[in-house]
Amino acid sequence: MNKPVKKQQPKKVIPNFEYARRLNGKKVKIFLRNGEVLDAEVTGVSNYEIMVKVGDRNLLVFKHAIDYIEY
């Protein structure tokens, strides 16, 4: 007997993503895992990256490279 194949449910959005999205447009201080600190403005957030503006440069920072964020 063949069992019916269940369709995979779409992944739910984790609360941390919603929290990070609220930082959009705010000035923050991002502490990276390598010890660097970025004084930046958050311009965009996706599942794995945060887009920030540091001075006149736009940077794409991977979330796994972030230690913590102060705002």
From Swiss-Prot:
One GO term under biological process is: regulation of DNA-templated transcription
Pfam families the record matches? Hfq
Instruction: Please give the PROSITE patterns that the UniProt record associates with this protein.
Output: SM (PS52002)
Q: What is this protein called?
A: Uncharacterized protein MJ1435
Which molecular-function annotation in GO is an example for this chain?
RNA binding
Source superkingdom: Archaea
Domain Sm, chain residue ranges per copy: 15-71
Q: Which InterPro entries match?
A: Hfq (IPR005001), LSM_dom_sf (IPR010920), Sm (IPR047575)
